[in-house]
Amino acid sequence: MADPIRVAVTGAAGQIAYSLLVRLASGQLFGKDRKVELKLLEIPQAMGPLEGVMMELQDCAFPTLAKVEAFDNPEQAFDGINWCLMVGSRPRGPGMERSDLIKINGPIFVNQGKALNRAAQDVRAVVVGNPCNTNCMIAAHNSDVPHERFSAMMRLDQNRAKYLLASKAGAQVIDVTNVVIWGNHSNNQVPDFEFAKIGGKPVPEVIADAAWLENAFMPTVQNRGAAVIKARGASSAASAANAALDHVRSLITPTPAGDTFCAAVMANGAYGVDAGLIAGMPLTSTGHGDWSIVEGVPMSPFIKGKFDAVLDELRREREMVKDLLPG
């Protein structure tokens, strides 16, 4: 059997991690024939609850779980890891603006970016903790790990969009392909129904209802997180954990011919995105943890206008944290 895959998970005592860790430990991501070692990171005051999470993982007696350890120091947690799932971030409190959240979380991702220098040479970092695009940018700019090893999660938005399109068309989710969420994981994201396909046909041909696509589908995807909070009194956890697994799976599995997946990556000029910004893009992978941007996706003036607006939002976020970006 191959060596175990070493995976660090930050925010490991939180709700997303609670849904994520059991599936990760049970072999649902890397397979039943590959053992995993989990290195769980939390803040010192959460080490008690994290001990309980560790006990539960141990009590599952998964054959695929080789080891589980708890840390409150990122350098120790990231030592020798192959994957880093950066789930932890300070949540938005009452009366907090997004700008407040960005400034509070920035220093956390500076430290974690530097700590990633202790990881294995093939490490990949996936940022889930919000605001994930800008947190990912901060971590990448503060690490010696190549920038193409970093990505931020847009997969929950992609999955939400796929479900809504399939439901409206009376199709199966598996029939929906090429869903792109352009830009930022915020309520200004751009769920692109024009490039998406259902059963191999462009969505506007299958769902010939422009008013629904523009005025119902897009806002529903953009505001789904808030709707979940309103309904259950807590933010998305199980669906976010599932999306994180889907995100990694798309990086370790060759992309099916003719399809794409979506994640936020350092675009460096593609589609006019400023160098250094982390933006949602259409991607493919060879299945070796890599990604390539799919160039040449057409944008109507409607989609392009919204994309330009969300790029401005990402630029404003970068300006807020410019003192945390070396060079």
UniProtKB/Swiss-Prot annotation:
It is an enzyme of class 1 (oxidoreductase). It catalyses: (S)-malate + NAD(+) = oxaloacetate + NADH + H(+). The keyword Cell cycle does not apply. GO terms for biological process: malate metabolic process; tricarboxylic acid cycle. NAD(+) binds at G11, A12, A13, G14, Q15, I16, A17, N105, Q112, V128, G129, N130. Belongs to the LDH/MDH superfamily. MDH type 2 family. Its EC number is 1.1.1.37. The keyword Oxidoreductase applies. CDD domains: MDH_chloroplast-like. This is Malate dehydrogenase. PANTHER family: MALATE DEHYDROGENASE. Substrate binds at R92, R98, N130, R160. NCBIfam families: MalateDH-SF1, PRK05442.1. Pfam families: Ldh_1_C, Ldh_1_N. The active site is at H185. Catalyzes the reversible oxidation of malate to oxaloacetate. Keywords: NAD, Oxidoreductase, Tricarboxylic acid cycle. It comes from Magnetococcus marinus (strain ATCC BAA-1437 / JCM 17883 / MC-1). One of its GO terms (molecular function) is L-malate dehydrogenase (NAD+) activity.
